[in-house]
Amino acid sequence: MSKIKELFESGKFKSAFIPYFTLGDPNYNDSIEFGKTILDGGADILELGIPFSDPVADGPVIQRAVARSLKNKFSFDEIFRVTKQIHLHKQETPLVYLTYFNPIYHCGITKFLDNAKDSGVVGLVIPDLPFDTIESETLFQELRLRDMDLIHLVTPASTKKRIEALRKTSTGFIYYVTSFGVTGERREFSVDLKERIRFLKDTIQLPICAGFGISTPEQASQIAGYADGIIIGSAIQRVIEENGQDASKAKNVLADYITKIRASIS
């Protein structure tokens, strides 16, 4: 049983809290400290973003974070070292990479997965993963060999045919994109969000975690009433962006925000 499957079956929470931030922003050491702060604040799963030059699914806040990380020339070796330091701080909390396929392909699928697993990563979210290619089939097989999860994104535009295809290779949980467009904070969500999540639960029979746009404790609490998990990225990245020049202040503001979100969905 994968670590993520075990977590969702444990009954430890009403809805999982899955924060996200981009590795390497604003620098190597602060990435480690921010990761530790988020874990201490009550993350059930921590999603770590690997910087890539063409983050097509990301909104402006995360795009700027990625740009800062790339400006630092954050290497694969540094990504894996930072990840391991975060993992060692709280080894019981699953870590997941959000990455585009190009970095995996560039590194080499087996090399990337070996290093990721050694660093404490138990699953991948790949927004632009191609289907029905030799590379994707290799990735599916190599993930299964390592008991690592492949977490697919489902959007409001996903067809039944697409959802059925995703069901065959999805493990861990489904990342449900709450609204059209890229990542970023939003004031309102679709009126049929609750029904859509229930449909996915019945169809795919995996935990459904909602992300894209959630930023306030009130939003998190509302959606946690019917989603198995809440994913928050842009709001966390904004805290880092606005306070990153003062690491101590950033940690305090981040800790306060994470604690409030965690309390809202407990």
Curated annotation (Swiss-Prot):
Pathway the protein contributes to: Amino-acid biosynthesis; L-tryptophan biosynthesis; L-tryptophan from chorismate: step 5/5
Annotated HAMAP family: Trp_synth_alpha
MF-aspect GO terms: tryptophan synthase activity
Protein known as: Tryptophan synthase alpha chain
Gene Ontology annotations for the cellular component aspect, listed alphabetically: cytosol
PROSITE patterns linked: TRP_SYNTHASE_ALPHA
Family as reported in the entry's similarity comment: Belongs to the TrpA family.
Keyword annotations of the record: Amino-acid biosynthesis, Aromatic amino acid biosynthesis, Lyase, Tryptophan biosynthesis
Reaction it catalyzes: (1S,2R)-1-C-(indol-3-yl)glycerol 3-phosphate + L-serine = D-glyceraldehyde 3-phosphate + L-tryptophan + H2O
Enzyme class: lyase
Pfam families: Trp_syntA
Organism: Leptospira biflexa serovar Patoc (strain Patoc 1 / ATCC 23582 / Paris)
